């Protein structure tokens, strides 16, 4: 992902304030609510029968945290996203058979959640930088599919 120095600073400064536990669970939960077909990959998570059940599901929250911890690793390695996410790409492609479009959807949901949490601090410039990052991460995760 090519970010200017200003964009990298904006992304890392905001990310330092992110509560990974809270934002991760909310982002994954919203993905499952807004795009219900993605739930098929999480059948082992138990009750996903309603938005309240999804948002309160401890397995959704735990996996959301795990996802954002991986995203944090990506932010430390913006110049090598494909390498950083190679094993996860292989897992999601070969073993889990996740539709790579879901990575793009989750990235966009994450941007919405960040905007909600940070309000005015999430300026259009910060959003533009995050859109680049989530697109880069989604492409890296989809790499094994090509």
Curated annotation (Swiss-Prot):
List of residues that carry N6-acetyllysine: 59, 82, 144
InterPro entries associated with the record: Globin, Globin-like_sf, Globin/Proto, Hemoglobin_b, Hemoglobin_oxygen_transport
Residues recorded with modification N-acetylvaline: 1
S-nitrosocysteine modified-residue sites: 93
GO molecular function: haptoglobin binding; heme binding; hemoglobin alpha binding; metal ion binding; organic acid binding; oxygen binding; oxygen carrier activity; peroxidase activity
Gene Ontology BP, a term: hydrogen peroxide catabolic process
The keyword Secreted belongs to this UniProt entry's keyword annotation: no
Phosphothreonine PTM positions: 12
CDD domains per record: Hb-beta-like (cd08925)
Annotated Globin domain residues: 2-146
Binding site for heme b: 63, 92
Keywords of this entry: Acetylation, Heme, Iron, Metal-binding, Oxygen transport, Phosphoprotein, S-nitrosylation, Transport
Residues that bear Phosphoserine: 44
Organs and tissues of expression: Red blood cells.
GO CC, alphabetical: blood microparticle; haptoglobin-hemoglobin complex; hemoglobin complex
Gene3D superfamilies in the record: Globins (1.10.490.10)
Heme as UniProt keyword: yes
Family statement drawn from the similarity comment of this UniProt entry: Belongs to the globin family.
Subunit structure: Heterotetramer of two alpha chains and two beta chains.
UniProt function note: Involved in oxygen transport from the lung to the various peripheral tissues.
UniProt-recorded name of the protein: Hemoglobin subunit beta
Gene giving rise to this polypeptide: HBB
